[in-house]
Amino acid sequence: MRLKAALLVPAACLLLALAGCGSPSPSASASPSADSSATASESASAAPTAHPSVAPSSTIDGIKVTGDFGAEPTISFTTPFAIDQTRSKVLVAGKGPEVTATNYVDINYKGVNGYTGETFDSSWSRGTSVQLSLQGVVAGFQKGLTGKHVGDRVLIAMPGSDGYDSSGGSSDGSILIGDTLVFVVDILDIDYQSPHGTTLTP
């Protein structure tokens, strides 16, 4: 199959290493009161930019995942959780082709904030898989999937430096600077961006 760049799903923008991919803010009313404007300004300035620091773990063994490949997983761990570097583990091994850092991939995924334990995105909840380029996602996502295989279910935990720190967290405030992100990803298919297979001599 061919997974074209044009097939990128807008709802998966949290995965993309691009700033400003959140929804536009609602239009302001024609004549807002001075009091409401001041309150909004004060609330914005008071919003936290980072959670208190957490001693990072060097293992993801404490993250428990239940559910079969293809079904939305349940992810549980003790919060707040932080990881020292991007780490990944194959939970269910597939037998398909190996994923490279330049592939387009067709995946289902669920993302949970390591600090709060709250789910911030899930393709399963939208009822459709996501097609994206591993060259256009946050570093931790690329690191976690490179070298895995089609048919794998993969657990990935990434520190904020490999997540959304560079964009100041998520636009909706569900992810702050420094937050570790935990993903479970089912790799459904890939598309090659370079020649592959066995060379045949005429």
Cite the ranges covered by each PLM segment.
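Cross-family detector of peptidyl-prolyl cis-trans isomerase
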Residues: 2-202
